[in-house]
Amino acid sequence: VHLTADEKAAVTGLWGKVNVDEVGGEALGRLLVVYPWTQRFFDSFGDLSAASAVMGNPKVKAHGKKVLNSFSDGLKNLDNLKGTYAKLSELHCDKLHVDPENFRLLGNVLVCVLARHFGKEFTPQVQAAYQKVVSGVATALAHKYH
């Protein structure tokens, strides 16, 4: 992902304020609620029958935290996202058979959640920088599929 110095500063500056536990759980939860067909990959998570069940599900929250910790790794390696996510791409492609479009959807949901949490601080410029990052991460995660 090519970011200008200002974009990198915006992304890393805001990310330093992110509560990974909270934002991760909310982002994954929203993905499962807004795009319910994604729930099929999470059969072991128990009750996902209603939005309140999804958003309060401890397994959703725990996996959301794991996803965001992995996203943090990507932010530290923006120049090598394919390498950073090679093993995860292989896992999601070969073993889990996740539709790579879901990575793009989750990235967009993450941007929405960040906007909700940071309000006016999440300026259009910050959003544009984050869109570049989530797009790059989604592309890297989908790499094994090609």
Swiss-Prot record:
Gene3D superfamilies recorded: Globins
Keyword Mitochondrion tagged: no
Species lineage: Eukaryota, Metazoa, Chordata, Craniata, Vertebrata
Organism: Taphozous georgianus (Sharp-nosed tomb bat)
Any single biological process term in GO: hydrogen peroxide catabolic process
SUPFAM superfamilies: Globin-like
Modified residues (Phosphothreonine): T12
Protein name: Hemoglobin subunit beta
Modification S-nitrosocysteine, positions: C93
Keyword DNA-binding: no
GO CC annotation, single: hemoglobin complex
Primary role: Involved in oxygen transport from the lung to the various peripheral tissues.
